[in-house]
Each structure stands twice: as structure tokens, then as C-alpha cells.
UniProtKB/Swiss-Prot annotation:
Similarity-based family: Belongs to the arginase family.
Gene3D superfamilies: Ureohydrolase domain (3.40.800.10)
Transmembrane segments: none
Source organism per UniProt: Oryctolagus cuniculus (Rabbit)
Protein name: Arginase-2, mitochondrial
Cofactor note: Binds 2 manganese ions per subunit.
Residue segments, region Disordered: 330-354
One Pfam family here: Arginase
Length: 354
């Protein structure tokens, strides 16, 4: 081995010995599911997000990864409408039951669980599975929509606009039992969820938010208060009195469609990049993030390949910022600078650098 190779190897060993290892053990679950709504393509979201470099980005941040791959959900051959309106109830119920098992297994194994969808009906499974291991969890729901319609208030029949109603204890007597949903047990109470970024809320949803005193911050509130104040109030409510696991459920349509056009229900007036990244950065800084959903990336709805890639890349940015990437740059953290052990070694290192 040459003299230069020996010195280079010595330097690499010394630098690696002072790198602080990440505390994050992250499980990645792909959930290619679209039957919570009617538009095809959102089942391609997990592949698009993976292609945008998700696993490498998390690995570069020092995360210890367990990749469950993309799940294959059991098909339901005959899935009639419920009440002549609700779309694919048996498929949604069964897929979420299967997803809940995997999420529970990941969280029980000590991993922070990242689920990439897929439509937002998947939150029924991710939060249910998470709550089995962490019954005191709290939820930060970042979305343009409240997704809290019930099967009796929805006008679209799409279950991706209803997941919270199945999870909220206060609505237990307001939600009929759909075929395929008998396994679901409400697992969160209204003080345990905060919405951030709402800008398209149906009248029945607004009634529910007010009646059950559910905290939400609309885009108007964010403009009025500033995102820093919004996050301070969110944490004061959810973890101010008790430290507990956080479940971040993030719909890509929270961004303005100029930034994330490849999604099924875009709406003007969404947040810019810095405000949304601040949310995930601050959640990371609590040290309490236990599970994360990133949903509703639909590459088929992009007007161009560039739009599809930009939306998927933004999804990766959200996930990475939840695990330590900052807008200062995502760095493996140093505990200290590596000192030279002797003047001779310092001289050799200088030669290598030159």
C-alpha cells in the first residue's frame, strides 16, 4: 500500500471515530393504495418518492434503516358502495387493517415509522397501528383539508376525506360501522390532535371542529400569527404538560400547487416551502417524532415529468427535515473536531490535503 493511501486511510478512520451516530432508527413502509378516492395514480406515490432518493437521503443523515418495501394489499373482488355513496369501504378497511399490523410491528421494534402513500385514508391504519404501542400519542395533521367528514356528512363518498372521523373518540356515536371497518377502535381524543394549514374545509367539518373544540390553524391563522407562534401553541397544547409520541400526518397538498402540483386535490393559497419545512424541523427538534405519513403524491396528475419529480422531491425534503435535515444543510453531527495526534501526522495530513 502506498504512503498516500496509508495516510488517507488513517485520516478516514480518525474522522469516523469522532462522528456522532444518529439516534434515529427509521422504518420505511410503502403503501401503494388509491381506493380511498377515485383518481388513479396515487398508488404510484411510494415508487416516485423512492425514486426521488428517500432511502439514500435518510441513510446520509445517519439513520439506521429498516425498509419494509411496498406492501401488497389483499384485493377485494366485489366492493359495493355503502349507502349508495361511500367508495370501496371493504378495500379501505382491509388495507388499513393490514397496514396497522405492519406499523405496529415497526414501532414496537423501536423504529420511527415512515409510511409513504398512497391516499390519506391510510392514516386510519397508520394511527391505529401506532396507537396500539403508543396509546398516549398525539397527532399533528398538516393538510389543506380537515379529512374529518363522516360517512353521513361526506358529499364525495371518498374515504380519504374521512379518516379522522373513524379515529376520534368523540365521534364514535356519529359514525356508522362500514363493511370492513369492524376492527377499528377510536384511539385519539380531540385535545390530542392539531391541524395546521387548513384552507378548504367543508361546512360539516367546520361544525365538528368547533363543536368538539379541536385546535386548528388555517392558512389565515398562519399568516396572522406566524409559523413560529403556531408551532409554539401546537406544542404547548400537545406536549406542554406531558412528553408523548408525535404522529405527523402530512398531505403534500398542504403546499401551494406551484410547489407540489402532482396531487389529487390541490388548492391555491397553500404554504410556501419555508413554512412547511419549519413545521417538520420543529417536530424533529422535540425528539418525540414516532411516526410520519407522507401521502397524496400522484405522479399521473402532473402536467410534465418535471412536475412529478418536483413533487416527489418535495416529499423527500419533508421526510428528511423530520429526521434532522435543516436548511443549513443536513450534516452528520460532530462531537468534536479530530485533533492531530502528533506534529508528524499533522504534517502528513496537510500534504494529503494539498
Amino acid at each position: 500500500m502506498s504512503y498516500g493511501s496509508c495516510v488517507s486511510r488513517l485520516l478516514r478512520t480518525r474522522v469516523q471515530s469522532v462522528l456522532k451516530k444518529s439516534v434515529h432508527s427509521v422504518a420505511v413502509i410503502g403503501a401503494p393504495f388509491s381506493q380511498g378516492q377515485k383518481r388513479k395514480g396515487v398508488e404510484c406515490g411510494p415508487a416516485a418518492i423512492r425514486d426521488a432518493g428517500l432511502v439514500k437521503r435518510l441513510s446520509d443523515l445517519g439513520c439506521r434503516l429498516k425498509d419494509y418495501g411496498d406492501l401488497s394489499f389483499t384485493p377485494v373482488p366485489k366492493d359495493d358502495l355503502y349507502n349508495n355513496l361511500i367508495v370501496n369501504p371493504r378495500s379501505v378497511g382491509l388495507a388499513n387493517q393490514e397496514l396497522a399490523e405492519v406499523v405496529n410491528r415497526a414501532v414496537s421494534g423501536g423504529y420511527s415509522c415512515v409510511t409513504v402513500g398512497g391516499d390519506h385514508s391510510l392514516a386510519i391504519g397508520t394511527i391505529s397501528g401506532h396507537a396500539r404501542h403508543c396509546p398516549d400519542l398525539c397527532v399533528v395533521w398538516v393538510d389543506a383539508h380537515a379529512d374529518i367528514n363522516t360517512p353521513l356528512t361526506t358529499s364525495s363518498g371518498n374515504l380519504h376525506g374521512q379518516p379522522v372521523s373513524f379515529l376520534l373518540r368523540e365521534l364514535q356515536d356519529k359514525v356508522p360501522q362500514l363493511p370492513g371497518f369492524s376492527w377499528i377502535k377510536p384511539c385519539i381524543s380531540s385535545p390530542s390532535i392539531v391541524y395546521i394549514g387548513l384552507r378548504d374545509v367543508d361546512p360539516p367539518e367546520h361544525f365538528i371542529l368547533k363543536k368538539y373544540d379541536i385546535q386548528y390553524f388555517s392558512m389565515r391563522d398562519i399568516d396572522r400569527l406566524g409559523i413560529q407562534k403556531v408551532m409554539e401553541q401546537t406544542f404547548d397544547l400537545l406536549i406542554g404538560k406531558k412528553q408523548r409520541p408525535i404522529h405527523l400526518s402530512f398531505d403534500i397538498d398542504a403546499f401551494d400547487p406551484t410547489l407540489a402540483p402532482a396531487t389529487g386535490t390541490p388548492g391555491c393559497g397553500g404554504a410556501d416551502l419555508s413554512r412547511r419545512m419549519y413545521i417538520s424541523e420543529e417536530i424533529h427538534n422535540t425528539g418525540l417524532l414516532s411516526a410520519l405519513d407522507l401521502v397524496e403524491v400522484n405522479p399521473r396528475l402532473a402536467a410534465s415529468d418535471e412536475e412529478a419529480k418536483a413533487t416527489a422531491s418535495l416529499a423527500v425534503d419533508v421526510i428528511a427535515s423530520s429526521f434532522g435535515q435543516t436548511r443549513e444543510g443536513g450534516h452528520t453531527v460532530y462531537e468534536q473536531l479530530p485533533p492531530p495526534s502528533s506534529p508528524h501526522e499533522s504534517e502528513n495530513a496537510e500534504r494529503v490535503r494539498i
